[in-house]
Design a protein with these regions (language model features):
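N-terminal export signals
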Residues: 1-18
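Blade/loop signatures of beta-propeller domains
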Residues: 16-40
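Surface-exposed loop and turn segments in beta-propeller and other repeat-based domains
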Residues: 40-49, 91, 130-144, 148, ...
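Beta-rich, blade/repeat-based domains predominating
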Residues: 48-63, 93-110, 138-160, 191-213, ...
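Residue position within the beta-strands of beta-propeller blades
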Residues: 68-69, 113, 163-164, 216, ...
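Short loop/turn segments immediately following the C-termini of beta-strands
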Residues: 71-72, 116, 166-167, 207, ...
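Short, conserved, GDST-rich strand-edge loop motifs in beta-rich repeat architectures
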Residues: 164, 257-282
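Blade-level signature of beta-propeller repeat domains, shared across WD40, Kelch, NHL, RCC1
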Residues: 322-352
Length: 352
């Protein structure tokens, strides 16, 4: 069985050499009520002591700390305060460190790290490993030869673990909080309602009056898809042109990093769109309201609707390379993590 308990703490000592950081930029990006000043150097650290490769995802813990995961095994996890000061770092073996979710059991915070090399690891916030979920073949779900490259997790109200196998099978796999397999959700890779083209992200949406639902990314199809927690398809939220990463809920709004953007082809009388190509270094952030309407695209074009149809969204300002995640603090500032961005540290967007 690949659900394993681990008692060891994997911690890397660090030395944080404080240097003066540039003042906040006067440049304002975004639209409507969601505008931000750009602070590109907010998360910069001494590269010799605390290097990064890809800054993949970030979460906010109950202490107000910002916790980031990346794929540099000198320090997979960086913990910042809101000023950009490094508080801690740990993790030396997550070569595919990619997804990061946080869950509180009522008293303590726990992290779920997705390593795209084939595992999901539950840890404490100081790096102690508590559980590992490995290849689904151990549960009779897939054959051993079936690729398993998890990209994201979401934790249900009862502690169930939903794993998006975004770089592998394109299913979402549901486990109990103790790591027992329940079901697989979706129909694998494809364009049908219950299928995904890169199931890159997943989150629990508690904003509605009814039961919580799953929002699952279909990145190459430029959309999120909504399912019940038991895996029944509900609806599609199209975001033409935007190769979105995971959905992030904060209050009534939905945020996502757009890894890159592209012109799309609209089908006559059909809400489905097809990207024509992917353009490198064309990322931005997109923000949707509770009804699923795009209200702001920091770094991107102003959202435009024609006859109720959202038009193609593209990068407008060359501030970002590839936005891989966005984290929101209690003051509604944004922190943007990037993939393939010349080893850039997280960028802060201050709400104005």
């Amino acid at each position: 069985n690949t659900v394993k308990a681990a008692a060891g703490i994997i911690v890397v000592p660090h030395f944080n050499i404080l240097t003066s950081k540039p003042k906040l930029s006067d440049e304002v990006i975004g639209h409507g009520d969601f505008k931000y000043k750009v602070h590109k150097s907010w998360g910069d650290l001494d590269r010799a002591m605390t290097p990064v490769n890809n800054c993949h995802e970030m979460v906010l813990d109950s202490k107000g700390r910002l916790i980031m995961v990346g794929d540099d095994t000198h320090n997979n996890v960086l913990i910042y305060d809101k000023s950009g000061k490094l508080l801690d770092s740990w993790g030396v073996r997550y070569k595919g460190g990619h997804g990061l979710s946080i869950w509180n059991d009522g008293s303590d915070d726990f992290l779920f790290i997705c390593d795209t090399n084939g595992s999901v690891i539950k840890t404490t916030t100081d790096g102690r490993e508590l559980m590992l979920i490995g290849h689904p073949s151990e549960y009779g779900v897939f054959e051993k030869e079936t690729p398993f490259h998890p990209t994201e997790t979401a934790i249900g109200p009862n502690g169930d673990i939903y794993i998006a196998d975004g770089y592998g099978s394109n299913y979402v796999l549901q486990f109990t909080k103790d790591g027992e397999f329940i079901r697989k959700i979706g129909g694998g890779r494809g364009i049908e309602d219950n299928q995904f083209l890169t199931a890159h992200g997943v989150c629990i949406d508690n904003r509605g009056k009814g039961d919580p639902t799953l929002l699952i990314t279909s990145r190459a199809a430029n959309c999120f898809k909504r399912f019940t927690l038991e895996g029944k398809y509900i609806e599609r939220i199209s975001l033409p042109g935007a190769f979105i990463c995971r959905p992030v809920i904060h209050n009534d709004n939905l945020y996502s990093g757009v890894c890159w953007s592209s012109e799309v082809v609209f089908e006559e009388g059909n809400s489905k769109t097809h990207p024509t190509q992917t353009n490198p270094n064309s990322g931005f952030v997109t923000i949707l309201d509770k009804k699923g309407k795009v209200v702001s695209n920091p770094g991107g074009t102003q959202p435009t609707y024609k006859k109720g149809e959202l038009q193609t969204m593209l990068q407008e300002q060359s501030i970002f390379n590839h936005c891989h995640d966005v984290c929101i603090d209690n003051d509604e500032n944004l922190y943007v993590c990037q993939w393939n961005a010349n080893k850039a540290y997280p960028i802060k967007l201050e709400r104005v």
